[in-house]
Amino acid sequence: FDDEVTRHTLYRNLRDPYAREWQNGNSRWDIIDMVRLTYALRPEGINWPRKEDGSPSFKLEELTVANGIAHEAAHDAMSDVEATIAVAKLIKEKQPKLFDFVLQNKDKHSARAMLDTNTMKPVFHISAKYPASRGCCAMVAPVAEHPTNKNLVIVYDLREDPSELINASADQIRERVFTSQAELGEGVSRFPLKGVQLNKCPVLAPANMLSTLSPERLEELALDGDTLRANLAMLRRAPDLPAKVAEAFDQPHESDLTDPDEQLYAGGFISRADREKLNWVLEQPVETLGELDVTFEDNRLQELLFRYRARNYPGSLMGEELERWEEFRSQRLMHPKKGWRSLEAYAQDLQRLAADPELSPQRRHILEDLHLYGESLIPYI
């Protein structure tokens, strides 16, 4: 979530949305799946909180309480960051080999090396898509490359009998992957296929890392060796399956995102030539922004530049530009399209939050400030 907010903020302000993630040796890492892997394979030394149904809870605020980690204000950004670092340190202390393994294999090249669709070599995979009652884990077989996304490999959960999948057509596979269980109805289950995003720090491990688990632990995670091997053998005896699965995942995607503010991903990467022009714009004195004569290859950028000026340097707008901006603001705040919050809905949300009798004085003060901010917009629309 934080990455998405940061990326979009940078993008809308003409900055490179990705540079901070790779320049100067930087990289990204989301440790939640490492926490889940630790629970599944090396839980010793850590207290694992449980939900009412007995399944493990991986909520940060519950992990910190169970392990005596200071976390004074759950969901406060800085407090959450400090607590997350403390949980990572706990795992590094209690299970250093596992910690180092995940850290060293978090990039997409390591993930690619583990997911061999030619041999369908089984891989242990961690994902919130698998139920917590089963440790959020599965032994999967890499079945097919995604037909259009080179950073996505489609895998199959080897716990499940693949007979129906093997006999299904591409259209039937598509229906039983992308249709909700509620819509499929009783007696028809979704096929346990999922995409592994290579560039999103997936947590994968060789199958032999399970060799130290006791029979009781394997049973708890529903990882029966005979079942896994039998299902893998069936997949390998279906030579036409990878092509059918790839076809099923080949869905034309018509983006309904037409507003440049929303088109960080829908519009593709900004070209090097346009990036150089944007960097040049950012270097210009504020008083000259209204006089710049710059054009871009990317059709998003002219409007983004206009909005950048309007939001940050409204004094750079002249004549028709001012009218255009006020018309845009009025439309966005009073009659927004689906997905955007109107000023009226904003006020209603604040009122609903303020009605909470347990709201702290600090949070109530924040809501009052937000209410005043909303009111300050009214004279201009």
Residue ranges of each PLM-predicted region?
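Metal-dependent phosphoesterase core characteristic of DEDDh/y 3'-5' exonuclease domains
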Residues: 1-96, 105, 267, 275-316, ...
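Conserved DEDDh/DEDDy metal-dependent 3′-5′ exonuclease domain
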Residues: 1-42, 205-281, 377
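Sequence-level motif detector for i,i+2 pairs with an aromatic at +2
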Residues: 26, 150-153, 199
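Acidic catalytic cores of enzymes that act on phosphate-bearing nucleotides/polynucleotides
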Residues: 93, 104-188
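Polar helix-capping/helix-linker motif
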Residues: 95, 104, 224-225, 234-238, ...
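Structured mid-domain segments that build the active-site/substrate or prosthetic-cofactor binding neighborhood
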Residues: 177-223
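C-terminal non-catalytic accessory extensions
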Residues: 324-381
